[in-house]
Each structure stands twice: as C-alpha cells, then as structure tokens.
From Swiss-Prot:
Coiled-coil regions, chain positions: none
Annotated organism of origin: Escherichia coli
Keyword tags: Conjugation, Plasmid
One protein family per Pfam: Activator-TraM
GO biological process: quorum sensing
Keyword hit for Nucleotide-binding: no
Assigned protein family: To plasmid R751 TraM.
Gene: traM
Cross-referenced InterPro entries: TraM
Descriptive protein name: Protein TraM
Amino acid sequence: MSDQIEELIREIAAKHGIAVGRDDPVLILHTINARLMADSAAKQEEILAAFKEELEGIAHRWGEDAKAKAERMLNAALAASKDAMAKVMKDSAAQAAEAIRREIDDGLGRQLAAKVADARRVAMMNMIAGGMVLFAAALVVWASL
C-alpha cells in the first residue's frame, strides 16, 4: 500500500506541480477510497458467487425437469408403440387365421366335390349294371316260358 501512496504522491507532483505529504487529507481520502473499492470488490465477488450458485441450481433443475419430461414422453411413445404393435399383431393373426380357414374350406370343398362326383358316377354305373342284370333276368325268364 505504501508503494501506491508513494507513486500517487509522485504523480500528483508531476501532473499538478504540488507537493503532497503523507499526512495530507487527499491521501487519506485516497486510502479510504481504495479501502471502499476493495470492500466493494469483495462484496461483488461474494454476490457473483451466490448468483453463480443460484444459476447452477436453476440449470440443474431445468436439466432434471427436461430429463423427466423426455422420459415421460419416451414412456408414452413406447406405450403407444406397444399398443399399436399389439393391435397390428392381433389384426394380422386374425387375417392369417381367416385366410387359412378359407384355404381349408376351399380345399375341402374341392376335394369333397370331386368325391361326390366320383360317387355319383359309380352310382350311375351300378344303376346301369343293375338295369342290365334285371333286363338279362327278364330275358331269361321270358325265354324259358
């Protein structure tokens, strides 16, 4: 501090041409002013540190809030996706079951129709053969009379 005072005394003498002593009231004001400036700077540093801490707290809360909101949105999207996937799977299973049922019904219907046609043809042949046997028997009875 005394170096600053000596430097100030030299500066006042050089600029203004006035000799100032160490006990001059101007230097007392300078000392008081320097002390007030130092105290003010310390208090501003303290306020700045508190403000910085408050900003960090706010940023942390915002980060946590954003994380919580993102997690809620992700969970909602996941639930919606699961529901949509379950619905699509259910619809697809129903469509596949219906397609299989139609194929089985169509396949059985064709096979059954073919079997019925074969049975009808065999029945017609049996009726023709029976008619021929009846006609032959009638001829034998008529010839024997």
